[in-house]
């Protein structure tokens, strides 16, 4: 194994990228929800690209993509725990890509947590505003916070598969030797084989003499 340097940055740059991604995701999520609540009635469907993309205002008491309804308080606690972990863990990040991962996750989780804390019916039990409907893709209705969370998970898997660490270094396997090294190995093998044959032929020559 050998280390290959990826997009490695200092702690200040990594935190700046993380904060930027989080602010962008959170801002887009909250602004879009403000427009939806201000301009649509609950349950209303507005075609954007026919039936492929629609706005449909619903209030979701569950998790992302309207899953596990009725467990709002559990997701509120989990979201707060995730945010606390990211803030604590952020100083270890030295990679731009990983900073984007945690930034998108932070912004998305914070966006839905804001709804659960501040929206009806009560503090900590608020319903999340969902409005993006793509029936051809998934039956659930979601929002930009959900998109940010899923995007962070996809990027997380890509970075993990590629072996890129939090420090920005990538571990790669030496799958093939260089031509010079291969030629050197072949020469050494031939020499060893020739020496072995000469050694084994020695006793036979002695017996014949």
Protein language model regions, located:
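Alpha-helical transmembrane bundles and membrane-interface segments of multipass inner-membrane proteins
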Residues: 1-209
């Amino acid at each position: 194994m050998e280390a290959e340097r990826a997009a490695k940055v200092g702690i200040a740059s990594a935190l700046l990228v993380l904060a930027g991604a989080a602010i962008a995701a959170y801002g887009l999520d909250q602004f879009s929800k403000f427009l939806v609540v201000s301009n649509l009635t609950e349950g209303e469907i507005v075609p954007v690209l026919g039936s492929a993309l629609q706005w449909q205002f619903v209030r979701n008491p569950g998790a992302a993509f309207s899953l596990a309804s009725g467990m709002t308080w559990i997701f509120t606690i989990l979201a707060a725990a995730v945010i606390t972990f990211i803030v604590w863990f952020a100083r270890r990040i030295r990679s731009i890509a990983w900073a984007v991962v945690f930034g998108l996750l932070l912004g998305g989780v914070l966006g839905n947590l804001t709804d659960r804390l501040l929206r009806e019916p009560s503090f900590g039990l608020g319903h999340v505003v969902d409005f993006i409907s793509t029936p051809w893709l998934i039956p659930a209705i979601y929002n930009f916070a959900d998109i940010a969370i899923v995007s962070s998970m996809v990027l997380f898997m890509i970075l993990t598969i590629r072996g890129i660490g939090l420090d920005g270094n990538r571990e790669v396997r030496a799958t093939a030797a260089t031509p010079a090294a291969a030629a050197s190995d072949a020469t050494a093998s031939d020499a060893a084989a020739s020496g072995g044959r000469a050694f084994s032929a020695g006793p036979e020559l002695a017996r014949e003499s």
